[in-house]
């Protein structure tokens, strides 16, 4: 007993955990220790604590128990026992001893025990193991200077080649610091790293488990049980080796420096020992090491490739593919995966554990949160559960207040009611002191602050305490626009709904109420947000009626390449919301690759077939729309860049389209449709609208189109093939239910135009007609204009743009305006009248008073139309509904603009769009017009572009800047051909931040 008391301190320092555990087990088998005593001793995490507890228990039991302990020590560690009783004949540490130790360490660093680790921490109950051989990805590090700024990016190899001691590896939680140090040890053990070849010994030390001295720590963590040297001799030998010894010290942020001053000295007074040191630490403790660090390297973010490599190496193929797909479809996930810990947690959630299903962002953060609190409980075990819970609540309030104040940096004042040690020790908060007078605190990830805030808001909204509920609702009421809902507070609301069904119900109700009173139309953004909100809430069908208010009479866009779990669950669990949607847009895209030539297909049919197969409509799109029993109001399907379409595609398309009551079909740049459109139209009998763009049609296609007598809309765009006799134009008369007809940039001649005119005679229900960018049709427009005048009395929108409109055709239209009284939009721009233009425009203007509802008037240009300006303007002034007006290519001069200005200053207050482009005025004319802009307060668009290059006077620019700055709604101003210098542009951008083109 006296021997133990006399050598108590040395026993505590030198025994080590391994020997202490073996002695404890031995004494239990000899019935000296009870089961309870053994469990109490072994529960100690730190080696010295375990040894101290063992000695205290034995000393209380008396002399016989002490004798048994010494006997056990003699059996387990005879060298230490002989040292203790003074019988050991000391021998020096030989070169052979060091060689044997080096061999032992190299074997240790190659053992599974060292290479395999639990990425979620040894203190968790989750049995997931990673292997460094498979999971390590080459990290990037930032070299930092004295001012704590990133100076240069380094690979691990480059850092080792430039190594200076002590080297500090800095990084936030989960950034892979431990992995880097272990990798260095493994590289040394492999003897394949040139930068590490000169090191005779490499010691990897976990500072959290450090003993009361450096030698004791090495003995406890690394030495073989057969070592036969004493502390003084060994350390002297190590110090003589100098820079040839590398210490890898992991986790300075968890190091109790007062318990092991030797290691603290080794780091901070490194020149005294002359050994090489690499130490890792978290950001909040970097301030303790910056002064002594010769090289400070900060761990960089994971690249997307790093994340993908880790996922592929860790998971089984099916599990990896699922997570990789989720990573591809979510920019949010890509951002999170920059932090290795998030990749690890995402992998853990995919590993088939029943408690870990990777469904939502909330799941990821909730798992991380629980792990951090559970893993670091040992650091705060001295605090009661009530104190911990209170600080966690205040921590949530801090996050919530910060979000609504747009604050992500906090100071000591903000943490005045919180125990700082709780949050720092758990790892929920990071502390930054480098190059700062006052410490700054941040959540270790911005999105993590949003999660903590959402978690807290969810607790408030679902609380049984009315004061908490009121507090939560007060936060919700601060969100007053759809824009804020879908941008600034998007993640906050997602995490709120991901944490509670009750909170979800209240959030959905609030969002619907905000949208109801928001004057701006953000319907598309709101639907996308609602989709994410539903998925995050994991409520399935429970709140289907609540969600219906978010989707009613709105539009949902889906791209076939980005069909996600959100869409699948939405279709599966919320069919009532699908039916409530006014429109669903489905974009089916083929490949953009060049279609193989016939010769290539003959030479390599397999390759060609593979290329073609890439164009197939994906099965997941079919399953999404076909596997349910509700009905969509309107479905708009776009086939884009399909270079091949086979029977399977047509069948799939039919299955998709049959789910809707009404179908819109858009075909763009799809050569594979040519000749196959017949089959498509046969399988999609509910087509109401058909739009064909840059896709050639066969005669069979055209004939099938004109048989679709129930069709409401037909648009043919950018078709440069010759007109096929007996096709579309000849059969147009069959489409008697047509309400909208568009021909844009198609190839037709004079005779084709007359055929088109004959077809228009039958379209008595037509409400919108657009013929644009068509040339070489001679006087064919006269026939078309006559047909419009005779039969299209229901027209609301008439656009005849750049289509060879003649004065005669214009006069025909003008004379019939009394029968076209429903027209709201009349666009005749892009046409240039050569003869009798003045008279025809005058006649048109005189009859505009018959158009009670006209809002848009784009007049044609011409050689002499400017001479009717004074006759036209009084008529236009008498049209109160006019909001858009164009005098493009009117050859207006300074005098003409002055005339225009004299009329526009009164009676045109509702004008929002004014196009005066391609005219001939100079500064004086533009000055007169600029002066009256103040009388047009509703202007949103102005075009003052000139036909020729124009250098404005400085006074014009100054007054124009003043004028546009006073127009609150103006967002676009075109000044093409104005020669503006940098000073001019700077002033214009300062006034409205608009770009000169």
UniProtKB/Swiss-Prot annotation:
LRR repeats lie at residues 550-570, 629-652, 708-731, 735-758, 760-785, 797-820, 821-843, 851-875, 884-905, 908-935, 937-958, 972-994. GO terms for molecular function: ATP binding. CDD domains: CARD. Residues 358-465 are annotated as: Winged-helix domain (WHD). GO terms for biological process: apoptotic process; inflammatory response; innate immune response; regulation of apoptotic process. Transmembrane segments: none annotated. Residues 165-478 form the NACHT domain. SUPFAM superfamilies: DEATH domain, P-loop containing nucleoside triphosphate hydrolases, RNI-like. ATP binds at residues 171-178. Residues 1-88 form the CARD domain. Residues 95-300 are annotated as: Nucleotide-binding domain (NBD). It comes from the Eukaryota. It is found in: Cytoplasm, Cytosol. Its main location: cytoplasm. Keywords: Apoptosis, ATP-binding, Cytoplasm, Immunity, Inflammatory response, Innate immunity, Leucine-rich repeat, Nucleotide-binding, Repeat. GO terms for cellular component: cytosol. Key component of inflammasomes that indirectly senses specific proteins from pathogenic bacteria and fungi and responds by assembling an inflammasome complex that promotes caspase-1 activation, cytokine production and macrophage pyroptosis. This is NLR family CARD domain-containing protein 4. The lineage of its organism: Eukaryota, Metazoa, Chordata, Craniata, Vertebrata.
């Amino acid at each position: 007993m006296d021997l133990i008391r006399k050598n108590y301190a040395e026993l505590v320092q030198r025994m080590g955990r391994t020997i202490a555990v073996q002695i404890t087990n031995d004494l239990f088998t000899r019935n000296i220790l009870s089961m309870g005593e053994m469990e109490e001793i072994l529960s100690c995490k730190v080696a010295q604590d375990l040894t101290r507890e063992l000695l205290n228990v034995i000393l209380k039991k008396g002399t016989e128990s002490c004798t048994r302990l010494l006997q056990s020590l003699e059996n387990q560690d005879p060298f230490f026992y002989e040292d203790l009783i003074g019988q050991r004949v000391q021998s020096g540490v030989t070169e052979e001893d060091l060689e044997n130790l080096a061999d032992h360490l190299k074997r240790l660093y190659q053992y599974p025990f060292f290479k395999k680790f639990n990425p979620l921490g040894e203190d968790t109950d989750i049995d997931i193991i990673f292997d460094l051989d498979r999971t390590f990805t080459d990290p990037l590090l930032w070299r930092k200077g004295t001012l704590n700024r990133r100076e240069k990016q380094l690979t691990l190899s480059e850092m080792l080649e430039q190594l200076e001691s002590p080297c500090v590896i800095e990084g936030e939680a989960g950034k892979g610091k431990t992995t880097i140090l272990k990798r260095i040890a493994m590289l040394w053990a492999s003897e394949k790293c040139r930068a590490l070849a000169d090191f005779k010994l490499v010691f990897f030390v976990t500072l959290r488990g450090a003993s009361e001295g450096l030698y004791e720590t090495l003995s406890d963590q690394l030495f073989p049980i057969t070592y036969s040297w004493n502390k003084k001799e060994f350390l002297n030998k190590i110090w003589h080796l100098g820079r040839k010894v590398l210490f890898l010290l992991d986790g300075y942020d968890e190091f109790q420096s007062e318990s092991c001053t030797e290691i603290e000295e080794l780091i901070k007074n490194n020149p005294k020992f002359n050994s090489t040191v690499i130490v890792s630490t978290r950001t909040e403790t970097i301030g303790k090491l910056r002064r002594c660090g010769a090289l400070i390297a900060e761990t960089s973010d994971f690249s997307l490739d790093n994340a993908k490599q880790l996922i592929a190496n860790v998971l089984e193929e099916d599990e990896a593919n699922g997570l990789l797909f989720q990573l591809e479809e979510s920019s949010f996930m890509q951002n999170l995966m920059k932090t290795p810990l998030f990749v690890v947690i995402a992998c853990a959630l995919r590993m088939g554990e029943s408690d870990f299903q990777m469904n939502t962002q909330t799941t990821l953060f909730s798992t991380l949160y629980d792990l951090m609190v559970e893993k670091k409980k040992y650091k705060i075990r001295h605090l009661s559960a009530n104190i911990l819970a209170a600080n966690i609540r205040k921590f949530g309030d801090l996050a919530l207040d910060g979000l609504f104040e747009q604050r992500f940096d906090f100071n000591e004042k903000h943490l005045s009611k919180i125990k700082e040690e709780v949050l720092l020790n758990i790892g929920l908060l990071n502390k930054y002191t480098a190059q700062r007078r006052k410490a700054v605190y941040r959540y270790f990830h911005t999105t993590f602050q949003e999660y903590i805030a959402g978690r807290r808001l969810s607790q408030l909204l679902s609380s049984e305490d009315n004061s908490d509920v009121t507090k939560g609702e007060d936060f919700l009421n601060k969100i007053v626009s759809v824009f804020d809902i879908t941008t600034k507070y998007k993640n906050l609301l997602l995490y709120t709904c991901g944490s509670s069904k009750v909170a979800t119900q209240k959030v959905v109700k609030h969002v619907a109420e905000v949208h109801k009173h928001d004057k701006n139309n953000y319907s598309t953004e709101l639907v996308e947000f609602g989709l994410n909100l539903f998925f995050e809430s994991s409520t399935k069908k429970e709140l289907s009626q609540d969600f219906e208010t978010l989707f009613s009479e709105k539009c949902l866009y889906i791209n076939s390449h980005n069909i996600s779990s959100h869409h699948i669950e939405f279709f599966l669990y919320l069919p009532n919301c699908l039916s409530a949607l006014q429109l669903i847009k489905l974009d089916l895209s083929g490949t953009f690759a060049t279609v193989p030539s016939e010769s290539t297909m003959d030479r390599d049919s397999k390759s060609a077939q593979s290329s073609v197969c890439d164009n197939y409509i994906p099965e997941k799109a079919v399953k999404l729309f076909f596997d349910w029993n509700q009905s969509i109001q309107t479905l708009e399907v776009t086939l884009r860049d399909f270079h091949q379409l086979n029977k399977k595609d047509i069948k799939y398309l039919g299955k998709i389209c049959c789910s809707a009551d009404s179908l819109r079909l858009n075909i763009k740049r799809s050569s594979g449709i040519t000749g196959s459109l017949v089959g498509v139209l046969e399988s999609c009998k509910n087509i109401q609208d058909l739009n064909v763009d840059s896709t050639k049609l066969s005669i069979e296609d055209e004939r099938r189109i004109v048989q679709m007598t129930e069709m409401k809309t037909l648009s043919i765009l950018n078709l440069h093939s010759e007109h096929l006799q007996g096709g579309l134009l000849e059969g147009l008369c069959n489409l008697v239910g047509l309400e909208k007809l568009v021909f844009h940039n198609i190839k037709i001649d004079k005779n084709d135009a007359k055929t088109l005119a004959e077809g228009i005679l039958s379209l008595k229900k037509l409400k919108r007609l657009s013929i644009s960018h068509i040339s070489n049709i001679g006087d064919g427009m006269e026939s078309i204009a006559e047909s419009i005048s005779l039969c299209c009395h229901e027209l609301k929108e008439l656009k005849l743009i750049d289509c060879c409109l003649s004065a005669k055709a214009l006069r025909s239209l003008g004379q019939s305006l009394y029968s076209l009284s429903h027209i709201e939009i009349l666009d005749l721009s892009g046409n240039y009248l050569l003869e009798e233009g003045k008279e025809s425009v005058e006649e048109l203007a005189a009859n505009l008073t018959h158009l009670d509802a006209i809002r848009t008037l784009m007049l044609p240009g011409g050689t002499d139309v400017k001479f009717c300006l004074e006759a036209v303007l009084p008529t236009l002034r008498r049209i109160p509904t006019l909001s858009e007006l164009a005098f493009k290519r009117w050859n207006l001069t300074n005098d003409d603009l002055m005339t225009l200005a004299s009329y526009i200053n009164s009676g045109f207050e509702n004008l929002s769009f004014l196009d005066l482009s391609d005219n001939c005025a100079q500064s004086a004319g533009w000055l007169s017009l600029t002066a009256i802009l103040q009388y047009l307060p509703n202007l949103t668009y102005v075009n003052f572009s000139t036909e020729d290059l124009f250098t404005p006077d400085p006074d014009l620019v100054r007054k124009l800047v003043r004028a546009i700055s006073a127009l609150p709604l103006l967002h676009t101003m075109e000044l093409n051909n104005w020669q503006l210098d940098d000073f001019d542009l700077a002033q214009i951008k300062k006034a409205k931040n608009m770009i000169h083109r």
